[in-house]
Amino acid sequence: MTDSESPTPKKSIPARFPKWLRQKLPLGRVFAQTDNTIKNKGLPTVCEEASCPNRTHCWSRHTATYLALGDACTRRCGFCDIDFTRNPLPPDPEEGAKIAESAKALGLKHIVITMVSRDDLEDGGASALVHIIETLHTELPTATIEVLASDFEGNIAALHHLLDTHIAIYNHNVETVERLTPFVRHKATYRRSLMMLENAAKYLPNLMTKSGIMVGLGEQESEVKQTLKDLADHGVKIVTIGQYLRPSRRHIPVKSYVSPETFDYYRSVGESLGLFIYAGPFVRSSFNADSVFEAMRQRETSTSSLLPNKD
């Protein structure tokens, strides 16, 4: 694609949310308890920092996704609401202990850690992330841990250092189809993400590898199908597919609102490729991650799915 070419066709931005994107906000006592538990530890969560539309749902279930290595990112992706910085603070050596204390208070059995990209650090922050995970293993030995990691700028040694911690799920999102990647993701490449996923799958063949994409960014149906095939071909086992929702006017506009029927179709396409697909308008990488983990684990032992309603 040349500099003069537009990465997406020019289309009018949808004026209103369709009915399937309207939901009740389940606020209440449990939500308030989760909010207080997290904020009392001074911990950032991707739920808040990325303005996730599912925050009230997840916090009302006593679940949250912790954001490691700070609350500001060294990349400025066009879809993401996390703050950008060129000079982030050093990693907090007590972060693992703070997360462990919070996870204990919430009674978490499946802990999800995501991270900001730390291109300022030699290993992309892998060592700091490993320290957090090792602390969690010590403090909550029966809990399973899922990590949504950056691409570490393609640093395979950093990836292996992370995988040696025996996490339950390694998650790295391709985010969108290959054609739109330069427009959607800052400093990341589609092929490098596939390379990291494939390397993880080969390094630990029994590891649950996971990735996710957003739709509604201007992608074509054929491109989504190709992305699912690419992920399957590179060793991914679990894929989440959700509707892109614009956090603010300074972010990439929504090109289309994808119907629930289309999500069902994408799920059937992915399942035909052997993938475990969790798809729906509000699905995000870590949305209902505990249930997805249990459903995947049971699928691997040939039992029925326990997934909650995807909407």
Curated annotation (Swiss-Prot):
- Radical SAM core domain residues: 59-276
EC assignment: the record states 2.8.1.8
Quick check: keyword 4Fe-4S in the entry? yes
Q: Which reaction does it catalyse?
A: [[Fe-S] cluster scaffold protein carrying a second [4Fe-4S](2+) cluster] + N(6)-octanoyl-L-lysyl-[protein] + 2 oxidized [2Fe-2S]-[ferredoxin] + 2 S-adenosyl-L-methionine + 4 H(+) = [[Fe-S] cluster scaffold protein] + N(6)-[(R)-dihydrolipoyl]-L-lysyl-[protein] + 4 Fe(3+) + 2 hydrogen sulfide + 2 5'-deoxyadenosine + 2 L-methionine + 2 reduced [2Fe-2S]-[ferredoxin]
Principal localisation: cytoplasm
MF terms (GO), sorted A to Z: 4 iron, 4 sulfur cluster binding; lipoate synthase activity; metal ion binding
Q: The organism sits in which domain of life? A: Bacteria
Which GO cellular component term is one of those annotated? Answer: cytoplasm
Which note does the record give on the cofactor? Binds 2 [4Fe-4S] clusters per subunit. One cluster is coordinated with 3 cysteines and an exchangeable S-adenosyl-L-methionine.
Keywords tagged on the record: 4Fe-4S, Cytoplasm, Iron, Iron-sulfur, Metal-binding, S-adenosyl-L-methionine, Transferase
Query: Top-level EC class, please?
Result: transferase
Positions of [4Fe-4S] cluster 2 binding: C73, C77, C80
Q: Which InterPro entries match?
A: Aldolase_TIM, Elp3/MiaA/NifB-like_rSAM, LIAS_N, Lipoyl_synth, rSAM
Q: Which residues participate in [4Fe-4S] cluster 1 binding? A: C47, C52, C58, S286
Name of the protein this chain belongs to: Lipoyl synthase
Organism, as annotated = Chlamydia trachomatis serovar L2 (strain ATCC VR-902B / DSM 19102 / 434/Bu)
As recorded in Swiss-Prot or TrEMBL, the protein's gene is named: lipA
